[in-house]
Regions:
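Catalytic domains of carbohydrate-active enzymes that cleave complex glycans
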Residues: 175-181, 191-193, 205-351
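Catalytic-core regions of glycoside hydrolase
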Residues: 1-224, 319-350
Length: 351
C-alpha cells in the first residue's frame, strides 16, 4: 500500500524487500553480509546508509519509510557492519526525505529518534541543501554533512552535453548553510561535473569563492594565462546560465520519457537561456587553438570544448540534432565510457 504517499517509490531494480514481512529483515541482512564480505578489506573510513533512491517500503508497517522501516533496518544492520568493519564511521543519509510523502514527517521522525538515543552509532547525518530545509532549520542532534546536487541538474541526460559547471549554485548552497555544516559529500555520476567537485572541495576547505577556484583550475589543468584565461573563465561561468534544457521528440516534450519508445523523428534539445552560447563557443574555440596537443586531448578539456560546440550547433540548427551534434555526442560516449549506460547518463545517439 502507499497510504499517505504522493509518489511511488523508485523500484528500478525490482529487488525491494519489506523488512516487516516474515523473513524480510533476515534476507536484507544476508544480502548486506555478502556485500560487506567483498569490501571488508577496503577498510573505508565511512559507510553511509541511505533510505532512497533505490529501496524502501511504504506498507502500513514500514511507512513513513525514512523514520520507520528504514530506521529499524539501520538498527539491525549496524551491528552486522561492525562485524566486518569495527572502526568504520556510520553516516545516515536523508536524501529524498519528503519527496514521496510531501511532508517533513521523515525528518521529524529521525530528529525524535536521535533525541531519544536511538542510532547512537550514527556520527553524521547527510542532508541535501537544494530541496531539504528542515534539517538546516532544526536541531537534528547530529552534525550535518552537505550533499549538494552537482550532477543531475538542469539537463537530461546529465553529462550528455559535456561539462556542467554550476559555480553560482554551488557557492549559494554553501553560503546559505556553511555555519551549520561539518563537511560535504559532492557525489557525482561521472567526470563531467569535475569543476563542480573542485568548487565544493575548495569551499569546504578554504571557503574560497567559486570564480577563484575556476581560475585556479584553468591554470592548473590547461596552463591558461592572461587574456585567454579570463575569456575562458567568463565562458565557464556563463555555461551555468546556458545549461538548462529539455529534450523533445515528435509529439513529446518530456525529459523523463523512455527514449526507446518514441520512434524515429527529430531529436531536439531546447536550451532555455541561449543568449551567451555563441560567445562561449568563440572563447573556447579560440583557446583550443593555442593549447598543446596533450592538453587539447585531455578528458577535462574535451568535455568543456564539446559542451561549447554542442550548444552552439544546436542553436544554429533550431535545437535539432544534426550529424555534427551526433558526432559530438558519440565522442562523449567514448570519452566517458558510456556505451552500456542508461538513458539518464548516455547522450542521445539512437536513431
Amino acid at each position: 500500500g502507499h497510504d499517505g504517499y504522493i509518489h511511488e517509490l523508485n523500484d528500478h531494480y525490482h529487488v525491494e524487500i519489506c523488512p516487516s514481512r516474515p523473513g524480510g529483515m533476515e534476507l536484507i541482512l544476508e544480502y548486506r553480509r555478502k556485500m560487506l564480505e567483498v569490501f571488508a578489506q577496503a577498510r573505508p573510513d565511512y559507510i553511509e546508509i541511505g533510505a532512497y533512491d533505490e529501496g524502501g517500503c511504504s506498507c502500513r508497517d514500514c511507512a513513513p519509510w525514512g523514520c520507520n522501516g528504514f530506521l529499524r533496518t539501520c538498527e539491525k544492520l549496524i551491528p552486522v557492519i561492525r562485524e566486518y568493519m569495527p572502526d568504520v564511521k556510520i553516516n545516515i543519509s536523508m536524501w529524498q526525505f519528503g519527496t514521496f510523502t510531501g511532508t517533513d514527517v521523515e525528518f521529524e521522525g529521525v530528529e525524535k529518534a536521535l533525541k531519544e538515543g536511538r542510532l547512537s552509532e550514527c556520527v553524521y547525518l547527510v542532508a541535501e541543501p537544494q530541496y531539504a530545509k528542515y534539517p538546516f532549520e532544526h536541531d537534528m542532534h547530529r552534525p550535518l554533512i552537505h550533499f549538494p546536487e552537482i550532477s543531475m541538474y538542469g539537463a537530461v541526460p546529465w553529462g550528455g552535453y559535456g561539462a556542467n559547471p554550476l559555480p553560482g549554485l554551488m557557492e549559494k548552497l554553501w553560503r546559505e548553510n556553511e555555519d551549520k555544516l561539518e563537511g560535504g559529500f559532492p557525489y557525482c555520476e561521472g567526470i563531467y561535473p569535475d569543476i563542480n567537485e573542485v568548487i565544493m572541495l575548495r569551499l569546504y576547505r578554504d571557503n574560497q569563492p567559486a570564480e577563484d577556484t575556476i581560475r585556479e583550475y584553468l591554470i592548473y589543468e590547461f596552463g591558461l594565462r592572461g587574456e585567454t584565461l579570463e575569456k575562458v573563465l567568463s565562458a565557464i561561468m556563463d555555461m551555468e546560465e546556458t545549461l538548462e534544457r529539455t529534450f523533445e521528440f515528435p509529439g513529446v516534450c518530456n525529459e523523463s520519457t523512455d527514449r526507446s519508445a518514441q520512434g524515429a523523428g527529430a531529436h531536439r534539445y531546447i536550451i532555455a537561456h541561449p543568449r551567451k552560447v555563441f560567445a562561449i563557443e568563440k572563447a573556447i574555440a579560440d583557446a583550443d587553438k593555442g593549447l598543446s596537443e596533450e592538453v587539447r586531448k585531455s578528458i577535462r578539456w574535451q568535455l568543456i570544448y564539446l559542451r561549447a560546440m554542442i550548444d552552439a550547433e544546436l542553436v544554429r540548427n533550431h535545437y535539432e540534432r544534426n550529424e555534427k551534434v551526433l558526432e559530438y555526442f558519440k565522442q562523449i560516449v567514448t570519452i566517458c565510457h558510456l556505451e552500456h549506460s542508461g538513458m539518464y547518463t548516455k547522450p542521445d545517439i539512437e536513431a
